[in-house]
Swiss-Prot record:
Name under which the protein is recorded: Large ribosomal subunit protein bL32
Keyword Ribonucleoprotein: yes
GO terms for biological process, alphabetical: translation
HAMAP family: Ribosomal_bL32
Length: 66
């Protein structure tokens, strides 16, 4: 079994972990709904992209829910 010969210093350990940091998410405010959304993605609220309706929401009836 492999065992380290010397203790890894805090500096070396932290430098190794520097690539694990999470980047900040770029969100924009949707001009039509005012909700936050990711750029170049379909709006989850109303299904629009580039001011065009691309996704229609399915209306659930009481029979489907039960």
């Amino acid at each position: 079994m492999a065992v380290p010969k010397k203790k890894t210093s805090k500096s070396r350990r932290n430098m190794r972990r520097s690539h694990l940091a999470l980047g900040k998410v770029n969100v924009i405010v949707d001009s039509q709904t005012g909700e936050y959304k990711l750029p170049h993605h379909v709006s989850l609220v109303d299904g629009t992209y580039n001011n065009r309706q691309v996704v229609t929401k399915k209306i659930e009836t009481e029979e489907e829910v039960a």
